[in-house]
Amino acid sequence: MNHRGIPALFLDRDGVINEEIGYLSRSEQVRWVPGIFSLVRTAQARGYRVVVVTNQAGIARGLYTTEEFETLMDWMRERFLAEGCALDAVYHCPFHPVHGLGSWKQDHVDRKPSPGMLWRAAKDLGLDLAQSVLVGDRCSDIAAARAAGLRQAFLKRGTEPASCPDDAILIDTLAEVQAWLESQPEPR
């Protein structure tokens, strides 16, 4: 699926925007990953839409509700605005194929490594996936980026083995992604 339109910077949430703690559900648990606000400001200045794509198995497992997730994301959006940047859209997958409870137990097309959230964002926002990039911290993030035909994928070291991506760029900090964006020609 290739849409001619606006490029996007897709961000996984846990481990990329905020430190991974396992089933984040409240604002007081948030610890920002260093460099996240600067990265988002740079991406937006260069014409990228910033889109969060996040699996949320905590909803499927009954650890928190969709409403609690949305409240937390509203708070996060306010924090980004206070830092002079914005999250243009947030897509989440509340399903889990094994550990989901009731109707949450399913292998949904939106759950990474499937590219469903990326495809929906492209359709909803008029994005050009072939000019878009993704930053994730798991092999499932990279697989979703590849399946959607994204231009580039970055794997933040720490959560998964460095051998999982095929041609993803391994990074230690978000400043590396920011430098990469700054080195690229302006999107058309």
Where are these regions (language model features)?
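Short, solvent-exposed loop/turn segments at secondary-structure boundaries
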Residues: E28-Q29, G62-E67, K105-Q106
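Conserved Lys-Pro-Asp/Glu-containing loop-to-beta segment of HAD-superfamily phosphomonoesterases
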Residues: V109-C139
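Short acidic-hydrophobic, aromatic-tinged amphipathic segments that line or gate anion-handling sites
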Residues: I169-E176
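Substrate-recognition element of Asp-dependent hydrolases with the DxDx(T/V) motif
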Residues: I36, V40-M76, E83-H99, A145
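Acidic, Mg2+-coordinating phosphoryl-transfer loop and its flanking beta/alpha structural elements
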Residues: A130-I169
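Active-site neighborhood of HAD-like aspartate-dependent phosphohydrolases
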Residues: N2-V51
